[in-house]
């Protein structure tokens, strides 16, 4: 028996100002991170087929909370605050750079990192730093090049190949694909990657379900 994830059932659990205020470090967490204005909230909404799961902001970079969502039993998405926005004070930027590093290094339940980048402006300094931290911690990374609908097919494919070549320099497990919350490009790819990362927890849940099934009676 297998347990299938229904991403449309994903729901908000809590917000936290830093990792110390997150719920207990257990289960499997997949973190979503990206520069402000990369369409992270829209990507989460498209992934889950919900319009308002992650609230989009007209003032990027102002929301400095970690948002936790439950996908299934023991499976969570952690929406990390956007980084790198010009209007955010330097002190706040530095604080979040430290917090991101701490989260990647210390959160035992973190089993995968999705880094969202605008396909037209990928691999900025903080994007690269985030990937370096993840690779150093042995965390697999899925780079999603958002707003892929902004480029024509040929240019989109060329950009994906270019970023994949750049990603090879980091070593580790770093995949790169195009994504568009508007047209749906890459949604199935992202869900398949999350399924892969959540698989150990899903297998444990399936085993638990089988163990709870009543034994068939052998009485005549």
Curated annotation (Swiss-Prot):
UniProt xrefs under Pfam families: MMR_HSR1 (PF01926)
GO cellular component terms, A-Z: cytosol
Q: Which InterPro entries match?
A: G_ENGB_dom (IPR030393), GTP-bd (IPR006073), GTP-bd_ribosome_bio_YsxC (IPR019987), P-loop_NTPase (IPR027417)
Q: Which GO terms describe its biological process?
A: division septum assembly
Question: What keywords tag this UniProt record?
Answer: Cell cycle, Cell division, GTP-binding, Magnesium, Metal-binding, Nucleotide-binding, Septation
Q: MF terms per GO, please?
A: GTP binding; metal ion binding
The record's annotation in SUPFAM superfamilies points to: P-loop containing nucleoside triphosphate hydrolases
| Binding sites annotated in the UniProt record for GTP | 34-41, 61-65, 79-82, 146-149, 179-181
Start and end of every EngB-type G domain?
Answer: 26-200
Q: Which domain of life is it from?
A: Bacteria
Concerning Gene3D superfamilies, the annotation shows: P-loop containing nucleotide triphosphate hydrolases
Positions bound to Mg(2+): 41, 63
The cofactor named in the record is: Mg(2+)
Describe the task this protein carries out. Answer: Necessary for normal cell division and for the maintenance of normal septation.
In which family does this protein belong, per the annotation? Belongs to the TRAFAC class TrmE-Era-EngA-EngB-Septin-like GTPase superfamily. EngB GTPase family.
Q: What is this protein called?
A: Probable GTP-binding protein EngB
Native source organism of the sequence: Vibrio cholerae serotype O1 (strain ATCC 39541 / Classical Ogawa 395 / O395)
Q: Which gene encodes it?
A: engB
């Amino acid at each position: 028996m297998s347990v299938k994830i229904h991403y449309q059932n994903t729901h908000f659990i809590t917000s936290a100002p830093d990792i110390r205020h997150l719920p207990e470090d257990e289960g499997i967490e997949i973190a979503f991170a990206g520069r402000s204005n990369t369409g992270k909230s829209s990507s989460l909404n498209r992934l889950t087929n919900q319009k308002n799961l992650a609230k989009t902001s007209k003032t990027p970079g102002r929301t400095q909370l970690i948002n936790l969502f439950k996908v299934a039993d023991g499976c969570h998405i952690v929406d990390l605050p956007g980084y790198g926005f010009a209007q955010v004070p330097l002190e706040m930027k530095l604080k979040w750079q430290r917090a991101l590093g701490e989260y990647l290094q210390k959160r035992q339940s973190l089993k995968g990192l999705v880094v969202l980048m605008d396909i037209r402006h990928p691999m900025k300094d903080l994007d690269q730093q985030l990937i370096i931290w993840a690779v150093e911690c042995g965390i697999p990374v899925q780079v999603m090049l958002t707003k892929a609908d902004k480029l024509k097919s040929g240019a989109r494919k060329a950009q994906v190949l270019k970023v994949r070549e750049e990603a090879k320099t980091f070593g580790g497990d770093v995949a790169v694909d195009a994504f568009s919350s508007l047209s749906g490009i890459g949604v199935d790819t992202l869900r398949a990657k999350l399924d892969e990362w959540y698989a150990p927890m899903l297998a444990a849940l399936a085993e638990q379900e089988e163990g709870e099934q009543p034994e068939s009676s052998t009485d005549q």
